[in-house]
């Protein structure tokens, strides 16, 4: 039976060469497009999947009627400490702020992403110092920053970037360390990192916060508890504000 079907198929292919070629080509193109679509979907759904305990890392977000119900991930810096102090299921709360800046390196202007963050975010993102010191993590009036391996190779080639100056919009910073960070296939790429300089008050709502929950945490229950126990500083902004968390992967 199979042999007979193959004979008929081959006979039709030979007899209807043009139609067969068009059909085979269409099938091949469709298969390639389908495969590329599957690859793209998989790629888009696996951002930051490589991080340790990625299934327990969430981004804090707000949603209030004052802004017509729009969801925002911009929150106050002080909310991080509040979350870890009042909700035992939250193991880590790491505030950070990524901003694209026009910088000058060796008198050449380039675009770079600067990360304002503390040690909690560095630990959560597994950012390691491979050369230099931790001075870039010192508190206020800090004029030192760290550069990633990739950025160091891009802008300084074979030169040692330690001690070099980087001119930013408002400040001149000195590089004191080189860090290793996974900047591929992530939502949080950066070129430089330094201690937070932005306002840390409740009214300066321009930070992002990543939290890491403890194993077996009921996320819906945690969200309900957070909304039922919002800090007074957030309630004063709007009585309709709601706070939640969403998976980063």
Where do the model's predicted regions map?
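Extracytoplasmic
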Residues: 55, 88, 109, 140-142, ...
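Short amphipathic beta-strand/extended segments in non-transmembrane regions
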Residues: 58-62, 76-131, 233
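Glycine-rich loop motifs involved in handling phospho/adenylate chemistry
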Residues: 25-29, 135-140
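Residues that recognize and position ribonucleotide moieties
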Residues: 73, 115, 145
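Alpha-helical transmembrane segments
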Residues: 29-58
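Mid-to-C-terminal secondary-structure elements
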Residues: 118-134, 143-249
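N-terminal Sec/SRP start-transfer signal
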Residues: 1-31
């Amino acid at each position: 039976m199979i042999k007979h079907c193959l004979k008929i198929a081959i006979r039709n292919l030979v007899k209807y060469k043009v139609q067969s070629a068009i059909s085979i080509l269409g099938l091949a193109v469709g298969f390639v497009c389908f495969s590329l679509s599957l690859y793209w979907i998989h790629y888009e759904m696996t951002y930051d999947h490589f991080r340790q305990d990625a299934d327990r890392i969430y981004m804090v977000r707000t949603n209030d009627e004052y802004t017509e119900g729009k969801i925002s991930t911009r929150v106050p810096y002080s909310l991080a400490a509040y979350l870890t102090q009042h909700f035992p299921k939250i193991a880590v709360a790491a505030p950070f702020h990524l901003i694209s800046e026009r910088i000058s390196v060796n008198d050449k202007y380039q675009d770079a992403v600067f990360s304002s963050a503390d040690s909690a975010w560095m630990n959560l993102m597994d950012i390691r110092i491979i050369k230099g010191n931790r001075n870039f993590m010192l508190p206020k009036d800090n004029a030192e920053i760290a550069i990633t391996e990739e950025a160091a190779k891009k802008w300084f080639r074979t030169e040692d970037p330690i001690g070099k100056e980087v001119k930013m919009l408002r400040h001149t910073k000195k590089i004191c360390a080189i860090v290793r960070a996974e900047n591929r296939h992530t939502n949080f790429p950066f070129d430089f990192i330094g201690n937070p300089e932005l306002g840390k008050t409740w009214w300066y709502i321009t930070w992002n916060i990543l939290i890491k929950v403890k194993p077996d945490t009921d996320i819906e229950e945690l969200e309900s508890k957070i909304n039922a126990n919002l800090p007074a500083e957030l309630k004063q902004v709007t009585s309709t504000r709601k706070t939640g968390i969403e998976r980063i992967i």
